[in-house]
A protein has these predicted regions:
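Basic, glycine/lysine-rich polyanion-binding surfaces/domains
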Residues: 1-184
Length: 184
């Protein structure tokens, strides 16, 4: 049976056409794909991407491990920065692309593609054996939304004023509706 995101009931109430995507019941469309594409290009759209995988890496060797595991430098990031990167196998073939967030000096959150979450987790866990890190799959503990389109900042700023001060590939923690959120 497919998993349901924290927003599943909202999708149903709003009349979404739901499909199984990577083991998750996800909205394919609401009224029409054309109007939704128009919204993203000219206005703003909110996407439920809670099906994405979230893998926490923690421990003294976090930065060293991720520098070894990913194609981009993780150790160059300050807390509050993120990097889009690729995770490769021993022959240089791509396992997955992901975003790595430096949430503390010795802590990182990797957001991986939904269809690859278990495969990625297993690979990361296997590769971590020589490093002083802990690897945890937190995918079932996170809800994730993406806000996209030219009016995204305007919409988000109406709820969280600090959003406008974020730089490219930076994030911060905010409280929205009494819930702690991370904004990128």
């Amino acid at each position: 049976m497919a998993k349901k995101t924290p927003l599943y009931e909202e999708h149903v109430a709003l009349g979404a056409k739901l499909v199984d995507f990577a083991g998750w019941m996800m909205p394919l469309q609401y009224e029409s794909i054309v109007s939704e594409v128009e919204a993203v290009r000219k206005n703003v759209a909110v996407f439920d991407v809670s099906h994405m995988g979230e893998i926490l890496i923690s421990g003294a060797d976090t930065a060293m491990f991720l520098d070894w595991l990913l194609t981009n430098s993780f150790s160059a990031l300050n807390v509050g920065q993120a990097v889009y990167s690729v995770m490769c196998n021993e022959k240089g073939g791509i396992i997955d692309d992901l975003i790595a967030y430096r949430i503390a000096d010795n802590e990182a959150l990797l957001v991986v593609n939904a269809a690859n979450t278990q495969k990625d987790f297993d690979w990361i866990k296997l590769q971590s054996k020589e490093f002083n890190v802990q690897v945890d799959d937190l995918s079932d503990e996170y809800g994730l939304i993406a806000v996209q389109g030219p009016k995204s900042e305007s919409l988000l700023s109406s709820v969280v004023q600090e959003v406008s001060s974020l730089k490219y590939y930076h994030f911060a923690e905010f409280t929205i509706f009494n819930k702690k959120m991370h904004g990128e």
